[in-house]
Amino acid sequence: MTDTTPNGLLDAFWRYEAALMSNNLGELDRLFAPGPWTLRGDAVGLLVGHDAISAFRAGRGGAPARSVEELHVRAIDDDAAMIVAVVRAASGGRGQQTQLWRRGVDGWQVAVAHVSAPARVVDGTIWRIVGTPLVAGTPGGAAADEADAADAPDSARNAAGDSAGAPEPGLSGREAGSLDGETVAVKDLFAIAGFAVGAGVPAYLAEGRPATETASAVASLLAAGADVVGIARTDEFAYSIAGRNPHYGTPPNAAVPGALPGGSSSGPASAVALGQASIGLATDTGGSIRVPASYQGLWGLRTTHGAVPVDGLLPLAPSFDTVGWLTRDGSTLARAARASIPGVRRELTPRYALVDVSAAFQGEGQAGAGDGQGGEVERAVGEAAARLRAAGIDVDTEPVDVGDLAELAESFRQVQAFEAWGTHGAWIRQHPGALGDEIAARFGAASAVGAEEAGGALRRLHAHAARIAALAEDRILLLPSAASGAPDARATPAQLERVRSATMRLTCIAGSAGLPALSVPALSVTSVHGGRAPFGLCLVGARGSDLALIERGREVAAALTV
């Protein structure tokens, strides 16, 4: 260390501050060292390389206003120095910024930076409302709800089908105290007594009345001892898998800074990935649990259709709406599922088969938004299957054909659209301008799907569903959880529509047949900003095999991480 500040360093620092406050992207790019070794980190994650840092800045819309209160320089030599700045945000609170500056042919540039922003009480992109807790669970579980399979609603008891098996000895649907100490982020579609449902739409929330009863899916977790920490954001009316909300902002992707979090269960997913909750209570109609789980490296379960009661849940497309959970590990997911699914367990033979999904990626666009990754995604899943075989797990050598994926996805889209408009169309007509452009356009297209068209699509869908269900009777299907890694947060609507179309050709396989689907965070693909991004391997099981599917998923994850 030297005792003097190198010439020109402070001038460069103050140029950086001025550029930051004016959002001068060109100057900021010049003041950060070029190349793949430049680093910028904060509480959300680490950006590696100049290009990733530049893309992050371009997508965030400027830094919050602040002033520098203290400045500490520690020179390393004539051409390198550390600067630690204490900053005060205009909105209140203090933070710190640590930078390693190096002098080269282009003058002083930042090589490494770490930002500690003033602590936010609540991140409004993730949460609608939080408490400490918002709703307390029942410690030691639940005398309050001693329901077992015999007392469960008929819809839940029958969801597993005739072959689901008998209640497992000693297991109740809600295990007393099994979730003590766990915290839950509840997607803003579930009723919680005393709070209105907002569904990601401010105008809908403004007219909502506080619920008088709590949804069964929430009550089950509370009865097992979990606390509800808050109500988490969703895409508008849950009609998206991107994770963007034009009213409240985009929740951060904890695994890939600068990328989309995935939706529509974006808030619960980000809350869990960031450690702000241990369980995300969510819904999955066309992939809204599996996609954010894949994008953020989480475990995510779409349950058998009807396995978890949906009373107190704002629907989108009832034929496909399911309840499920997002967690950071398989053990917590298993406990959440046991606390919520009546005590009927169907076992699964540990036999697996890859699904031929090559048709899902036809017509992809250029890479850069996360689309165009079909080849890499297929290779990753194929290599995973080979590794499972090498570990002694029974994986069929030939992929299975689930039928015409394009026709399946289009039939699914038409039925989903018809039901979505039936659910929300009247309200949308009465509230022009209440939705953002992308979701408004999607509902506009849904309004054009008539009953005759939807009826034909439903008949085709039933034929596809029967074939898929038959394939899943004696093997667990393996396929990608999504069509790509997390797209760039700056992706255009056209780019996201391509990603959505390819992903829906995958997610509708389980959704059309009402089968449970588990996203296991066992794979990775190239990140949109370089490096690696998490990616989910999806396991699809027979109806009613939800609990066994999680256990098989844990075995698969263990085999792939050896």
Where are the regions a protein language model picked out?
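Glycine-rich, small-residue loops and helix-cap segments
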Residues: 334, 455-562
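General beta-strand structural signal in soluble alpha/beta enzymes
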Residues: 186, 228-233, 281-283, 398-399, ...
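Alpha-helix C-terminal capping segments
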Residues: 269-279, 511-513
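Structural helix-boundary/capping segments
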Residues: 116-125, 279, 285-360, 366, ...
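Short, solvent-exposed secondary-structure junction/capping segments
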Residues: 10-21, 29-45, 284
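Surface-exposed, charged secondary-structure patches
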Residues: 8, 39, 47, 51-94
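Amidase signature
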Residues: 119-179, 339-504
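Gly/Ser-rich catalytic/binding loops embedded in alpha/beta enzyme cores
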Residues: 75-77, 84-85, 99-112, 117-269, ...
